Curated annotation (Swiss-Prot):
Keyword Nucleotidyltransferase set for record: yes
MF terms (GO), sorted A to Z: 2-C-methyl-D-erythritol 4-phosphate cytidylyltransferase activity
Biological process (GO), any one: isopentenyl diphosphate biosynthetic process, methylerythritol 4-phosphate pathway
Entry-linked NCBIfam families: ispD
PROSITE patterns, per database record: ISPD
Family: Belongs to the IspD/TarI cytidylyltransferase family. IspD subfamily.
Protein name: 2-C-methyl-D-erythritol 4-phosphate cytidylyltransferase
Amino acid sequence: MKPHLHQISQIKLWAIIPAAGSGSRFSKTALKQYQTIENKTVLEHTVERLNGLTLEGYVLAINEHDHVAQNLPLTQKHKAHFCKGGLERVDSVLNALQYLSSIASDEDYVLVHDAARPCVSLSCLQALAEYAIKYTTNAILAIPVRDTLKQVVDRSHISKTIDRNHLWQAQTPQIAKIGVLKHAIQLALENNIKITDEASALEYAGAVVDVVQGRSDNIKITYQDDLELARLILLSQKS
């Protein structure tokens, strides 16, 4: 049975948006989160989507030289918090978790979401939060892999085809209790484990992580031409 929306309102929910990265694949000079789509920056769109949920607050982990984020007309600006980001995404997330620990309970839930995913739907956000809260678990949005996957060696030679039946493409947000996620990331970093997302840290710590099926339009803006695709998706979602 699908949980009701009121279950979310009984739990304190926070969000973290790591936004300190250089985004070198997008541009050597322009930060993708500050590119404009329909008169709003990507970051404004992202924050607006997350605020479709009833958040206690959200933390933006930004570069110490970033003078843009704090001056943006973000939705629910009174709920915005800022902390110093790190060299890597995982460092930014950990800094934000440590910041949250000073104002929130370790039992509160936190959603970690990429700054450059402005198209996540409210229905997916609700489904993810409801699932984690109902089952007291960690979870991520993900979609089944559709394309045939090839393993390649020596740059261009296919060595084998990968069975995709049990493969899912991870997205964000990813959700866990603040204390659980902070412990998992600290443990992984102490043991020099490469962390690519929150789920990988939780997995290393032995925690269960479930997938909640997301949507293919929850794209991450990585390259210049992704901006136009994101614009089209945002327009289609309004219609």
